[in-house]
Amino acid sequence: MIKKLLCITALAVTNSFAFAAQDFAECRQFFANGEIPAIDHKQELSTRALCFSNFAVLHSGKSHTPLYVAEKLNRDSVIAAKDNERTNRFFADARLPQKERAELGDYKDSGYDRGHMAPAGDMDTAEGMAQSFSLANIVPQAPQNNRKAWASIEKATRKYVTRASGDVYVITGPVFDSNVETIGSNKVWVPKYLFKLVYDKSANKAWAHWIENADAAKIGKPISYAELVQRTGMDFIPALIN
């Protein structure tokens, strides 16, 4: 099944990569060594780079979802986030052209949760918390997956960060298969799988959580960075390969 996955998970044409890299100039701090994930395959996904105060998003106007979301966490930020009140005010991101963005109505009665890629629980400022509810940071997620298995993965990641000696870089995103399901009038793509890559730079180690976007999905053993690259076709942290 994995071999049949489309690498449109987070791929774009070469000139789109240059465009994205240029636009991420104001938020390169969320990427390890300031390096934007390498894009090797040619898929036209109408990508746009979006900078937020606590994370960065590569958004696709074709899927109407993020392709990946990058964060930089550390012990202090995770501890501060515990006291930050959740807002729950979802909104369509006006920075995106109307034809490229998801709208609140797309998720209404869809049977899917509005699943955060950069979790609200990671946000250590009021501004970051509010911004995390942008639909540019959201994918259609199976409700029980979002509230149980995926929530456990998010909590485990924060727990690890509190024990880390330095900054930890996290990249989260959806993976779509060839028979993609859509929701709403804008045909927002529903992921087949979700991944969360964790890179502890000071310890020089990385791993990824990989889970099916289904209510009955169970948390499996984390996969290696090399396996994530193989499954997605994306080199998220070039330094780890080079």
Range-by-range predicted roles:
Residues 15-242:
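Domain-level detector for secreted/extracellular nuclease and nuclease-toxin modules, and
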Residues 5-14:
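Sec-dependent N-terminal signal peptides
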